Structures are given as structure tokens and as C-alpha cells.
Amino acid sequence: MRLLRITAGLGRGPLPRVPAILGWQGKQANWKTYRWCSSGSIPNEKIRNIGISAHIDSGKTTLTERVLYYTGRIATMHEVKGKDGVGAVMDSMELERQRGITIQSAATYTMWRDVNINIIDTPGHVDFTIEVERALRVLDGAVLVLCAVGGVQCQTMTVSRQMKRYNVPFLTFINKLDRMGSNPARALQQMRSKLNHNAAFVQIPIGLEGDFKGIIDLIEERAIYFDGDFGQIVRYDEIPADLRAAAADHRQELIECVANSDEQLGELFLEEKIPSVSDLKLAIRRATLSRSFTPVFLGSALKNKGVQPLLDAVLEFLPNPSEVQNYALLNQNDSKEKNKILMNPKRDDSHPFVGLAFKLEAGRFGQLTYVRNYQGELKKGSTIYNTRTGKKVRVQRLVRMHADMMEDVEEVYAGDICALFGIDCASGDTFTNKDNSDLSMESIHVPDPVISVAMKPSNKNDLEKFSKGIARFTREDPTFKVHFDTESKETIVSGMGELHLEIYAQRMEREYGCPCITGKPKVAFRETVTAPVPFDFTHKKQSGGAGQYGKVIGVLEPLAPEDYTKLEFSDETFGANVPKQFVPAVEKGFLDACEKGPLSGHKLSGLRFVLQDGAHHMVDSNEISFIRAGEGALKQALASATLCIIEPIMSVEVIAPNEFQGAVFAGINRRHGVITGQDGIEDYFTLYADVPLNNMFGYSTELRSCTEGKGEYTMEYNRYQPCSPSTQEELVNKYLEATGQLPVKKGKAKN
């Protein structure tokens, strides 16, 4: 009871003393410590910026909730899905608490052993991948959470690729060791085979499933138990006798894996010397920071086991802001390597301020902009510049975020994550002070949307609310795209999946009081050519007075399959036949004409327009002439080309009980899926397949019915590839019917 009274008081005013078990080793602690953590006197060594990311339902939010509790940031723990009527702190949106999923990245900060930790909890659904991209772009390190039962899953691979793209060092935490069928050894094996990671256990479990009692620390060679009602008392003991041999073997394996990627430990290993605990810890840190080794930790967040050692590992093995190299680009036309400028992580005002807006949110007091500070100092009341728009803005209010609660601060320094109010900007914008307004941070990678639906308000009187909501959502989320189809007179919204668009339709109703009607999902088909086609096109227009004249000669080429979503323009002209000032006009004409293909009306992609020669007229040639010439050249080339329709292919992962294996395989085959792999544990099997997105609609209902509700699946975009002849014929006929070039079949309504 005494302990409960202490923890219940956390977060409300000064505390006389906080016990060592909560992360402070018997030091005086005050809640206001959190308010001091932005000050310049806090060195970089005392700061960590980390993200927690994983596949859906691996336990990221539950883990974050435990971290906040053990570090004294929250007084009581709550469960995901609001089982206790409250819901997790980090799931602040009502929809998140209802569904038990994380939709937006929530930012918080806490303290562990005198080190300030900024944490971003990210979604696991592939539909919300942009949130993970944004988080990893601005973090220095991450914790990748795996489920001990599911192991490496679809989204785990996506997150791993994203971490590689942004060069983020990370630890792995295998969660849910208390679940039936948990197998951490299998999860480790999958990390090595599927993700190609040089990974090894730093801990091994004492028991599994219902017998999971604690963990063995292989570095310090001791057993760790978690006592007390909430696992808050960490107790160290000797390794149980029956596990000593296994612990020795795993420790040797750990040393070998680290020695393979760290030179200093490798030398000790070759000399057959036994490394000391500090030697091993330093080697693991060096190898983790260089991304050549992944340490693997174990536990069960729900059962309050293994969280405190993971926090210690974050401090020991993940980098502080001064150990990460962040670059800004000079805003020049040729942004090559030489134009990259290294940011200085010093926590003072000796260098100009540079920050990146990585997330936007509509808060209670206007737009909230999350900013990662890379260099210099940002003060409340100071003036900063948006390098994209060139506009200057005043920082009226500077806050630190704890999920949806905020705390005002006077200044932040390099390495801090903060939020600004009332600043008009877009995600990925760079802010600087006047001294260096030609700098910008590298922009965040934004994947293309793969699915579209028509959306309109149920009530025509709600059009104003609808447009307000759409404007806000597109500003906050770059993967949520909107355009107006002039032919069907419909507003088309595009996103990363059915769930993504469904969530926005629900948010429109909840947050703007505007119920929406959504149409049938439409897949983002594309058209491309199968072989190079030459063109030689002249645009001439004489109507008295100044006319128009532009001639272009070149070739239209298909791109490689991995570039099917791109459009490229190549200027290979010599001399002044096509004046250089008109080349961008030719490119504009080409890109404009790619908006609609001749075969099925879908966009053209996977093309390279190579401009080789042409001609101009001294008087009649102008920009519009060459725009029309570019458009005409593309149409001329397409008229003699062999076109094909390409479609998005999804990587699908299905998990279901073994008795339904036949039905699941048959279902995937019916949807023209190509099975790429399979594995199984206990009574469940996992099927991996590549399936056209067009064939995946309604699959969740089919899977539920054929597995008695026990099967589940996830999918993510993989690539574009040519669709089947039958699908192509169907799409072409549908387009011809819609445009009146083909009579509509009897009994079939126009689409």
C-alpha cells in the first residue's frame, strides 16, 4: 500500500523522495525536473530521442504505457482498447481508444536514471505508414517490438526498411512471452533470415507462456525478477541451476555475433581472451550505433516484465543527439553531396537555429506543429523563417507534448522535440532563423497512395464542413490525396488502404459533424508502354498575327519494372534547335498529357520521354507552343505503341489455424495470388503471397467466414506489374462504355 501511495502521487507537485525502483537511485526528485530538461545546461549525453514501432498488435502502446509508469511519468497504468474505461495515455484520439489501434504518432517525454527520453509511439497498421516515416526521420534511435508468437511480420519488414533508409540504430524487444505459442528463438531466427540482421539475445527467458517468471541478463550473468503488484520492484538473483548451461551457450553466441561486427572485441575473441562486462557493453554500443548488430531483449509489457532492463538498454546502447550525423541541404539547383551541411548538435545559441516540422495536428488552440530541433536555440517570442515559402513567423507559444496534454517551455535546444502553435506550414517544412534561410532538411519519403474512393457529405448543407475537414486532413497527412474528377463530378480521396480512408470518413463525422457517403474503392491502375517508340511531332498554328510553332523529335521509353510508378524526362538535345528556355515547357506538356491514358483513362507512368532534337521559329515559338508540342508528341508515340495496364500488387500475410489451410490456400488462388512462402508454429500456419489489390476487396469477410473468425491477415504495397489480359480487357471495355465509344451491354448499368 505504501508503494501505491507513492506512485499515486507522481505527477502532482513536488515529491519528498522517489524510490530507486522507479528509476532514480535514491536521489531527490521533483516533478519540475521535467521542466528543466529543455535547458541548455542539460548535456547531449543526458538526452535520448527514440521511437517505438512494430507490426500491428505487437504491444507498442502497452510497452509505452509501462515505460511512462515505471519512470514516474503517469500515476496509474491503463490498458489499450479502453478495457478499463479509460484507454492508454498515448491513444488520445477517441477512435484509437475504441478500436485499440494507434492512428497518429503520439509524442511524450520522461526521465530514467537522470536521462531525458523523448518517446514517439507509432502506429503498426500499414495504412498509417507515413506516421512511422515521420517519426523515424526525426529520431536518433528506435525500439523495434516483435510479438513472440507472430515473429517478423509484414509491417515489421516495412519498419526495418524505413529504419535502414534513415540510418536509425535500434534495439529489438520481443514482447508477449506470456502468450500461448510464444517462441522467441523462432522470432530471432526470422530476424536473421527475413531481415538479414546480425542479431543475438542479450537476455534469455526463465520459463515461457504461463511459466514466464523473469529473464537472465547474459551480459551481467544474473537472473532478473519483477516483484510487486505492478512488477515495479526489480530483484536480481543467481541464474537458476537448470539454465546455467543454456545461459553460457547464449552468452558465447552473443560475444561471437558482436565480435563479427566490432573490431576491438574481434581482436579479444581471436586472442581467446574473455571480455569483461564493460568491454562487452562498449562493443555492443559501438556495433549497435553502426547498425552492424541488433541486440535482442525479452519481456511481457502486459505482465510488467522486462521493461526496466529495456530502459537501461536505451540509455546504454542507443545514441544521444551528438552521436548522430544530421545533414541540411543548401537550396541550390544541383543538391549533390558537396552541398550537404552537417548540423552542429551543441546545446546553445552559438549556431543558427534549424528545425524540421515533421507532423501537423489540429489542436484545441489551432494548428499544432511538431518540430525537431537539429541545431541552435529556439526561444518563445523569436522570429523564424519557413525556407519553402520564405515567410517569417513569430513563435508565440512553445510547448512540450505528453500525448494530448502540453506543457509550456521558454526555449528548446538542438536535440529537443517540441511543438509550436499557430504556424502555417506543411509537413516536411524546414524552419531557420534569418542567418541561414537557404538551408533545408532532407524531406520525408512519402509513399504514393494505392486506393481511391469517391466521398461526399450525406447532407448537401455540410459542404463547408466537408471542405474544411478535407483541407485539414490533406495538410496533416501527405499520403491522403484529394482531387475533383471533372467527368464524374465527384470528389475522389486516395490513401494507403481501406482502413486509412475509413478512418478519415469517421473522423469527418466525429470532428466536423459531417457524415459522409463513400463509393466503391477504386484501384490506382496505370498505363505504360512495353517497348521504345520514336516520335517526330510539329505543332503549328496560324490564325493571323503571331502564331505558334514547336517541333520535337525523340523517343518514348518504358522504365524498369521497379520504376513503374515514375515519370522521367531526359533532355539530350545539342545546339539551339530547341532553345533551352523551352525545354521545361516540353516536359510540362509531357507530364500534363500523362494524366490520362488512351487505353482505359488511367494515368500513364513508367515512362521516360527522351528529347533528342526539334526546331523552333524566331517569331512564332513560345512556351505554349512547346507545351502543345510535348503533349502532341506523347499522343503520337502512344498511337503507334503497344500499351499495357499495370496494377498494384500487395504482399499479403495470412495467419490461421492449421485445419483451415486448404480453404485459405484456395481463397488466395481464386484471387490470382502467387504464394511466395509458408511457415507454421504449433497449431497455426502463416501464408505469404503476392496478390493484386484489385482482387483483395472483401477478403476480410471471406477469411472470417472460412476460418470461423480465427484467421487474420495484413497486406502492404509491394510493386506494380502488368495485370492479366482478362482484367485489362474488362477495364478497356468499361472505359469505352463510359465514354460512349461502345454500346452498353443489356442489363448492365453505366459505371
Swiss-Prot record:
Cite the binding residues for GTP.
54-61, 121-125, 175-178
Identify the residues that the record assigns to the tr-type G domain, covering every copy: 45-322
Q: Tell me the residues of the organelle transit peptide.
A: 1-37
Where located? Mitochondrion
Signal peptide, first to last residue: none
Phosphoserine sites (modified residues): 92
Identify the HAMAP family for this entry.
Answer: EF_G_EF_2_B (MF_00054_B)
Q: What is this protein called?
A: Elongation factor G, mitochondrial
